[in-house]
């Protein structure tokens, strides 16, 4: 069955995201614009706008639209913000952040995903996104500090390297907790050198792999 991507996208935003309390207009508008079906495997395109995470290969997933919206809203993105993303995946979250006006620096550790995301984002003319193939738990120090940092995989703790690369003031959003996709979504703020963390609730992500991950 063929889907109408635009209609499905608008329905996704209204029924799965806005209806569940996400109110940031910048987030909602960005997710209305980004064609999620372009970031999933062809065989799963009919499910691209469903309320679920989907496999993208290499044991990784594209996050559920609602959790993408929640994390994006927590970041409080303003135009021109430098945002570090750990875990490019297929590139969907990076595209949403770019549509919100951010300059995105995204790190991916899996070569195949890095190559495919780089090509897709370039073809879609997201020139405000830079990608790097590396251990994301180490951040991207050459371009630090970052106004915002988002981690799209769950680790055992908040990597100190990422805290060090966070601007002051700055916001970091990261899933933290046990392996096997059971974590707590943590909101980390840095203000006048002081670090505060707030538990925003349960979540389920693939494992954060790297020197400061699993």
UniProtKB/Swiss-Prot annotation:
Catalytic function, reaction form: [protein]-L-isoaspartate + S-adenosyl-L-methionine = [protein]-L-isoaspartate alpha-methyl ester + S-adenosyl-L-homocysteine
Name of the featured protein: Protein-L-isoaspartate O-methyltransferase
Gene Ontology cellular component annotations, sorted alphabetically: cytoplasm
E.C. no: 2.1.1.77
Recorded superkingdom: Bacteria
Stored InterPro entries: PCMT (IPR000682), SAM-dependent_MTases_sf (IPR029063)
Organism: Maridesulfovibrio salexigens (strain ATCC 14822 / DSM 2638 / NCIMB 8403 / VKM B-1763) (Desulfovibrio salexigens)
Family: Belongs to the methyltransferase superfamily. L-isoaspartyl/D-aspartyl protein methyltransferase family.
GO biological process: methylation; protein modification process; protein repair
Organismal lineage: Bacteria, Pseudomonadati, Thermodesulfobacteriota, Desulfovibrionia, Desulfovibrionales
Pfam families (alphabetical): PCMT (PF01135)
Subcellular location: Cytoplasm
Keywords: Cytoplasm, Methyltransferase, S-adenosyl-L-methionine, Transferase
Top-level class of the enzyme under EC nomenclature: transferase
Main location: cytoplasm
